[in-house]
Structures are given as structure tokens and as C-alpha cells.
């Protein structure tokens, strides 16, 4: 056998060994997937994982079954969390600036990617039509909080595309009118050099929520309760939020802080018409990955808050999770606060509001971040 023939044999053998090794790995992983029960929830990613889709010929022919099964396999893949972390380290090594929907910003900021092509004018207009119904019926105040990519622009990688939320905010302001629009964008922009967003999570911090509270008070013509920002209490120094979960590697740790003045008077908090607590905070969440759940015991369809302040004053809040860290600041101005999260509430919104509206009326606040307003603001 000549040297060239031996080389070809070696190459063929190596190729077969490689194919065999890959097949063996895939076989082992496949067996592991079959043996392991599906996970319902990812603690590291703080989200519900996709479950096995139900087969039907209709869903198969439409392509929906294939898409759902692909998502299911991606979520339930054995060792998924470790593989995500390995891929992230490789991407960082190759100096990638966007990983799994997260920009690696300067000063150790992780900033969520909001694709400008995803959020269309049609989507904006549809949400604004629903919003206008609330404003017309209830004289609602509207606060749409810009996400970090629109305020911390100096932290973004060069030329990083992001959805321009100022377009949405201008349309909302024009639609609902200046009297009902709360300009929190300007308030946050003015304090952009301060830690108003978490470095590893998509929410604003308690300091950011405080500036939102001041913007709300100004729009209402109220003298704001004098919370002391220098006196904020730190309850955690190892928070790593939703954005860190997406890249699944260790990152800078955030602090969870709150205003202790919100605990001066006793409160009664009822969650989902059943469970009752005597605090606006749930410290048990500080022992979990989802430490932001410390505020208002995470997310619930409906919350009732009774305080010792301002007899007869009632506020009804329609919100996403951004509101969770600001609502405690509002308790100094109302005796009763009702809170509904449309992502979990399946009833008729106006019917619920009419049921809880007192004879003397109530204030209504719509509080979302801009992205979740576009994605989740729907009611019946």
C-alpha cells in the first residue's frame, strides 16, 4: 500500500470515528432525554419551560407542531444550562457583543435586545386603542417606563440596534393627552448616570422606581412622601437577574434595596383573593434566583393592599412587574390600592374595576415598561 493510499485510509477511518463519536454522544443524550422527566420550571432562567406539544395533523401541516417541538427540545435538552454557559464563554472569547438576546454593555451592564423589526406601528396602534378606552372611561394616568437600552445608550455596544421607544411614547402622549401622560422618560434620562437599572436584570432598581414615583406625584399635583434615598435598606448583595440567566455565566452582582419608610405603618395585603400577608415584601425570595420577587411577593393576578394612610383614597393599578418596586412608595398616599396584572388575570377588566370602585371614585394608573406594554397589554 502506497503512502497516499495509507493516508486516505487514515482519513476515512478518522472520519468514521468522528461520525461514530458524534452519533454515540447524540444517542447517549437522546437516551438521557428519554429517561429524564421534563422540567416544568428553570430556576436559573426564572421562567416556565416549554412542555411536549400535543400532536395533531392540523398542527403538523401548519408547521405549528414542528415549531413547538423544536422549542420543547431546546428547553428540555439534557444539561441545557451547562451548554448555554459553555456557549456564552466561547462567544465572549470571540468578542461577541450580543449573546442570546443580551447585549454585553460597558461597565458590566447586561442590556436586553429589543429588535426594532419586532415592534411594528400596527402593534403600537393596537395597544394605544385599548389604552385610550381605559383613559376615556376611568381618566387613567399612564406611565410607560423606557427600558435600559433607551436610557443607558452610552452603555450599549457601538451600532447596536434597538427599538426606539420615544416613537411609542410620543404616540401615547398624543393619544391620551398631556394631563393623563406621565413623562417618566425625561425623569430617568436626567438621572441616567445613577444606578436606576440593574446590571443583570431587565427591571429598574428601587432608585429608578423612586424617580418614577416623583414623576407620578408631579403629574397628580401631589406633594410626594419624603422618602430618603440615602437611607435605602440593602437586603441582598448577590442578585443576578433575568439577563444573567440568559447567558448563564457568573456576572457582576446587583443589590436589592428598598425604602424602610414603607414599613412604618401596618398593611394588609391579599393575594389572588385568598392568601393574606402583613408586609409588602417577601424576604423568602431572597433565597431564590428570583430575588426581584421580594417586591410584592412576585407576580399575581390580583392584589389588594390596605394601609393606614389617607382614609377614603383608592388607587387601581394595571401593571407589569416594573410596578412591583414602585407600588410600595404609593402606599403613603392611599388607604386602598388594588393591583391587577393582565398576564395572569383572565376575567373582564372593566367589570372588576366597577366591582371595586368606591362611591367617591378612584384614581387609576397604568404602569408598564414599554416592551411589556406592547407584548402584554391586552384586556377584555
What residues fall within each predicted segment?
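Extracellular glycan-modifying ectodomains
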Residues: 1-380
